[in-house]
């Protein structure tokens, strides 16, 4: 059994994905340290579910004053899990935690490229953003 840890910003972009075999303080610390190192600044808020592993990890990093926990507060992260869960069911599970980590990291980058917040843009803006995303995608595929 593996657990999916996902960090999502306020706009719904996936910041990072981590696949771990445990849901404990050490795993929570690993994700938080990875994010703090990658982005080099503390977040405005850290919203999590009621898992008790987050509070000690935030305390160890000195960001416990930013930590908000509770039911329904982390809906953005939970909703970003849904496509992954559907895809995982279709693929009959991943063969290993490593293959899940590689796939999900690549998928997050592609998702962020094509994730246009449609309800906040006009049709014209949406078409322009979508065309830019497709151009980027074609460049990446051609380089590979």
What is each stretch, according to the model?
Residues 19-23, 41, 47, 94-99:
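Conserved, non-catalytic sequence blocks in retroelement Pol enzymes and Pol-derived host proteins
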Residues 70-86, 95, 100:
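RNase H-like two-metal-ion nuclease catalytic core shared by retroviral integrases
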Residues 1-42:
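RNase H-like nuclease fold core
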Residues 52-62:
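Short, aromatic/basic amphipathic alpha-helical patches
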Residues 62-71:
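Short hydrophobic/aromatic-enriched beta-strand-loop microsegments
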Residues 7, 12, 32, 46-49, ...:
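Mobile genetic element proteins and their domesticated derivatives, centered on retroelements
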Residues 90, 101-144:
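C-terminal domain-tail junction helix/linker
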């Amino acid at each position: 059994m593996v657990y999916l840890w996902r960090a999502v910003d306020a706009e719904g972009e996936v910041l990072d994905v981590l696949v771990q075999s445990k849901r404990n303080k050490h795993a929570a610390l690993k994700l938080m340290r990875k994010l703090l190192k990658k982005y080099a600044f503390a977040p405005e808020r850290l919203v999590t579910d009621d898992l008790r592993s987050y509070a000690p990890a935030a305390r160890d990093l000195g960001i416990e004053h930013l930590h908000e926990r509770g039911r329904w507060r982390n809906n953005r992260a939970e909703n970003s899990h849904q496509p992954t869960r559907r895809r995982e069911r279709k693929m009959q599970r991943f063969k290993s935690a490593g293959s899940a980590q590689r796939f999900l990291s690549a998928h997050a980058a592609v998702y962020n490229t094509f994730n246009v917040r449609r309800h906040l843009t006009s049709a014209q803006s949406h078409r322009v953003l979508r065309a830019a995303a497709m151009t980027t995608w074609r460049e990446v595929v051609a380089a590979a």
